Regions:
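A polyampholytic, Gly/Pro-enriched intrinsically disordered region
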Residues: 98-109, 269-276, 344-353
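PAPS-dependent sulfotransferase catalytic core
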Residues: 1-198, 334
């Protein structure tokens, strides 16, 4: 009843009010930290992890299967969405779960990099917007909310990217952006080269990982969920942020994705018509032009379940692992159980005609 009442109240309040309350709390936290006298922080230049792997997918494509597979290796520490088998006790005892969104989301590290370009640096409106989006993204992040010990790292990064904070009582600079109503301070971005920005981000991420996993490291390869986005760009684009990073992309029969989206009404995945879905999938797959990228491995979800040993061998070769590292084999990913999901989309006859049409339009993304 309490949750229902909270939902009703939130639906009545202007969205901008909620957002600004959150954003202003970040600045309040920051100001308190500055007054504490403990604000002299230097980021780590080395990381406790030797290498990194990001697991990407095209949306409901089964990438969590590879996350579960890599949990079984003693060489890996996995940071991913909470698995079904993780108890609430595990989470309360320090389990770290969730997609890593600090880089890819609006206001994240990649966004700030884009805004660091000369055009944004000289445009006060864009710079102010960039900093406020950063504040919003950080305050809403699970890491900031659930791991308060990391907050000084975010405050320090905030200081590094902002050149000036002008305290104002007049209406905010970007008056047309209602979500910024009530936040009247004006921010400017610090001018820095790409090399300087990459180093800042790299050391910030190292410090964050070192703090979060200081006593939880189970392997020297950190596995992350969609750290830089959804399959786009050659991995060399992201190496300045995290050296020694590789990517595994999991794709799936798009008919299975479509039926799942329809059954669950997955609103962020276009499925109101076959045409809309096909357009979405073409766009998602088009962005992943990585044929010459030696640091990317693409796997088919169906093959992982039906040709388990062969696909596992591919993963091991790609990451430089051996079968001896696979110490918890089939503990988290059991193909004998999971393969029941391979052709389950055929069972729902309601979407049979749609699936036939999808096969006609994009056969290259269908399996079998």
């Amino acid at each position: 009843m309490k949750n229902k009442l909270r939902h009703i109240i939130k639906s009545c309040l202007p969205h901008g009010y909620i957002v600004n309350r959150k954003r202003n709390c970040f600045l309040d936290d920051y100001d308190t930290w500055k007054r504490s006298g403990n604000s002299n922080i230097t980021f780590d230049s080395h990381c406790i992890f030797d290498s990194f792997v990001t697991i990407d997918g095209y949306g409901c494509s089964g990438s969590s299967a590879i996350m579960d597979l890599l949990r079984e290796y003693d060489t890996c520490t996995v940071w991913a969405s909470k698995p079904a088998y993780a108890s609430n006790t595990e989470i309360m005892n320090g389990g770290i779960y969730g997609e890593f969104d600090l880089c890819r989301h609006t206001g994240g590290l990649l966004y700030i990099e884009h805004m660091m370009k000369e055009e944004a640096w000289v445009n006060d409106f864009w710079a102010d917007n960039a900093v406020k989006n950063f504040i919003q993204a950080i305050y809403y992040s699970d890491i900031y909310q659930n791991y308060p010990s990391t907050r000084p790292l975010f405050f320090t990064f905030f200081e590094h990217i902002t050149d000036q904070r002008i305290r104002c009582s007049m209406p905010q600079l970007n008056v047309w952006q209602h979500r910024f109503t009530g936040l009247n301070d004006i921010f400017t971005l610090k001018k820095m080269s790409k090399t300087e920005y990459y180093e800042l981000c790299r050391h910030f991420l190292y410090s964050l990982f070192n703090m979060l996993f200081a006593d939880k490291i189970s392997g020297k390869t950190l596995v992350l969920d969609h750290i830089f986005g959804d399959c786009g760009d050659d991995m060399s684009r992201f190496e300045p942020y995290l050296p020694n990073i590789k990517r595994i992309i999991v794709t799936r029969d798009v008919r299975a994705v479509y039926v799942h989206a329809c059954q669950k009404n997955t609103e962020w995945l276009a499925h109101d018509s076959v045409e809309a879905f096909v357009k979405w999938e073409r766009k998602m797959h088009y962005r992943s032009k990585h044929e010459s990228d030696n640091n990317t491995l693409e796997l088919q979800f169906e093959d992982i379940m039906l040709n388990y040993d062969r696909e596992v061998a591919k993963v091991e070769q790609f990451l430089g692992f051996t079968s001896q590292h696979h110490t918890a084999r089939k503990t988290y990913l059991n193909p004998e159980i999971s393969k029941s999901n391979v052709f389950s989309w055929r069972d729902d006859k309601l979407y049979a005609t749609d699936c036939d049409r999808i096969k006609e339009l994009i056969p290259e993304y269908c399996y079998g």
